[in-house]
């Protein structure tokens, strides 16, 4: 099957050369041959363009080389304002078509995002934001834009996950990386499967959702009575191997099982926390109190005042304030990130309504953090 893929790619290259030479019939013939050999998205997209718009002569698109690459032998995609009609009669430009073909031609996740192999989180986020806005199906109606958008999302989902990225780099199988076949299965190692759909990933970046850690009121295990939980999506990987696969899965799950057992044992060995930042009827922590220093409200049970006095009470109130400040700091970070992303999207789309919405965000947690900071300095 992979031999057919190579032959199909050669046919697509011949078709592009024919288009550049103005030979529409030859290009169409080789694209149809490529379709029979292997279902390449680039061949299908080019064939649709020929059938709808005739010859698309010009420089053939190619993957964006990562920064630092010395290869300058390939021509850049030409700018062209020629427009066509996509699905549902919506228009698209030749630039958009070239961009879609460029993405679909990329052979690994790094080429899809246009980053180097040592790119950090910020580089990946910057590259994803730029490409996701450019190729989102609501904005780009060129043939194959949806597949390109999915490919971008899958590439980011893999490279932004340290474990998947490590597994992806170790295989060395970049030729087939991040290409999704028509039968709905990836044709390479399972480490390149995304745990989140491209649309959900887009909503996280531009819809206000942030999968960051959230501080909950107290799990014990240290003197401060606070614990931060990091929520992560977990994907269900497809079973591809038989035989001793069950034993391999068991070995892989052993660290997780050990962690769960240790966590359960630690919970059994730790006493209930003496306070909560929110009323909790289940533990009887419904009596409202306030710290002496910052005036932070917290809730205790009916026996608290008898058990905690003097220095013990001061230690508890110090823990209350530390947990409260941590909570406010995390929420302030989320507010700032949301505002930054909205401003970026408004700039890209030139959307005044979105810009006004970003400017109108109340930033309540950030204001509270400033108030607490001034109290600390004043104290």
Swiss-Prot record:
One of its GO terms (cellular component) is endoplasmic reticulum. Residues 266-379 are lumenal. The keyword Zinc-finger does not apply. GO terms for molecular function: Hsp70 protein binding. Keywords: Chaperone, Endoplasmic reticulum, Membrane, Nucleus, Transmembrane, Transmembrane helix. Its main location: endoplasmic reticulum. One of its GO terms (biological process) is chaperone cofactor-dependent protein refolding. It is a single-pass membrane protein. The chain crosses the membrane at residues 245-265. The keyword Nucleus applies. Residues 55-93, 219-241 are annotated as: Disordered. Residues 1-244 are cytoplasmic. Residues 108-172 form the J domain. It is found in: Endoplasmic reticulum membrane; Nucleus membrane. Residues 69-84 have a biased composition (Polar residues). Interacts (via J domain) with HSPA8/Hsc70. Forms a multiprotein complex, at least composed of DNAJB12, DNAJB14, HSPA8/Hsc70 and SGTA; interaction with DNAJB14 and HSPA8/Hsc70 is direct. Acts as a co-chaperone with HSPA8/Hsc70; required to promote protein folding and trafficking, prevent aggregation of client proteins, and promote unfolded proteins to endoplasmic reticulum-associated degradation (ERAD) pathway. Acts by determining HSPA8/Hsc70's ATPase and polypeptide-binding activities. Can also act independently of HSPA8/Hsc70: together with DNAJB12, acts as a chaperone that promotes maturation of potassium channels KCND2 and KCNH2 by stabilizing nascent channel subunits and assembling them into tetramers. Belongs to the DnaJ family. DNAJB12/DNAJB14 subfamily. This is DnaJ homolog subfamily B member 14. The gene is DNAJB14.
